[in-house]
């Protein structure tokens, strides 16, 4: 029981394959309640897939994925729908509705899932926009926003229903240093102010480790390391060092496997 209380998400011995490719081989990880957890690893390792497993969008081949003590893969469709209201996902693209202004984008989940009277809905939306610094942009369309503003608008929508869990899929990708700093600050402040549990998938090592309470590194279908930022920086595992230090060649090779070089230089080879 204590395990369920301490960890909002608890993945136990989870395996998942896509076609003939094994993505995860018997992995286990936990997401402590009210903390910021980072998921890191090389491109194509399955980090976004892990978020989809937690959200119940796809099911594992075997293993348990507990959310607040309930096994997500075993839930009925109606129960999963109810539980998902306690989760929110910030997509890499932001995924704003292009035909709605910023206010209506943030109001959308409130209109879909609550019966708030119009004045209270208005106040709630404006408070969420104020939290991300976009109250003055409420009437703008997504096409009028910069990339960073669009991410912040999407974040305001993600917190509209005050979820227990927010999952961030590469929130810092393609952002300039100022916007990246703003997003790092917002994630940290929302975690502190609301007590919301955050899972952040990111390649941006310095930024995500600066706010993560705990981090997990995926490689070779497994969890290869986990711990605090300090513990990971001291980890000597070559796979960890290559990823954290950005080393070009190592366990993840620089060159794609190929045949004899001289033979390939000949025409018709």
From Swiss-Prot:
Its EC number is 7.6.2.-. InterPro entries: AAA+_ATPase (IPR003593), ABC_transporter-like_ATP-bd (IPR003439), ABC_transporter-like_CS (IPR017871), P-loop_NTPase (IPR027417). GO terms for cellular component: membrane; phospholipid-translocating ATPase complex; plasma membrane. Its main location: membrane. Gene3D superfamilies: P-loop containing nucleotide triphosphate hydrolases. It is found in: Cell inner membrane. ATP binds at residues 41-48. One of its GO terms (biological process) is phospholipid transport. GO terms for molecular function: ATP binding; ATP hydrolysis activity; phospholipid transfer activity. NCBIfam families: PRK11831.1 (NF008809). This is Intermembrane phospholipid transport system ATP-binding protein MlaF. It comes from Escherichia coli (strain K12). The lineage of its organism: Bacteria, Pseudomonadati, Pseudomonadota, Gammaproteobacteria, Enterobacterales.
């Amino acid at each position: 029981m204590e395990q369920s209380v301490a960890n909002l998400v608890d993945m136990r011995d989870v395996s998942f394959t896509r076609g003939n490719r094994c993505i995860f081989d018997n992995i286990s990880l936990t997401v402590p309640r009210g903390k910021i957890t980072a998921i890191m690893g090389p491109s194509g390792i399955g980090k976004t897939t892990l978020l989809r497993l937690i959200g119940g969008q796809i099911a594992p081949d075997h293993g348990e994925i507990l959310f607040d003590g309930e096994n997500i893969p075993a839930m009925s469709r109606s129960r999963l729908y109810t539980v998902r209201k306690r989760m929110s996902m910030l997509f890499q693209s932001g995924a704003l509705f292009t035909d709605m202004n910023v206010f209506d984008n943030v109001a959308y989940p409130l209109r879909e899932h609550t019966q708030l009277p119009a004045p209270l809905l208005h106040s709630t939306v404006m408070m969420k926009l104020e939290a991300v610094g976009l109250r003055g942009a409420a009437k703008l369309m997504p096409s009028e926003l910069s990339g960073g503003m669009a991410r912040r608008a999407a974040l305001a929508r993600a917190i509209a229903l005050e979820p227990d869990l927010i999952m961030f899929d590469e929130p810092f990708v393609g952002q300039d240093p100022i916007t990246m700093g703003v997003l790092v600050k917002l994630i940290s402040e929302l975690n502190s102010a609301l007590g919301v549990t955050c899972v952040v998938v990111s390649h941006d090592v310095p930024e995500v480790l600066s706010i993560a309470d705990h981090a997990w590194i995926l490689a070779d279908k497994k969890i290869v390391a986990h711990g605090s930022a300090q513990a990971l920086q001291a980890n000597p595992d070559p796979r960890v060092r290559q990823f954290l230090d950005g080393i070009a060649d190592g366990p993840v090779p620089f060159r794609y496997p190929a045949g004899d070089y001289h033979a390939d230089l000949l025409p018709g080879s």
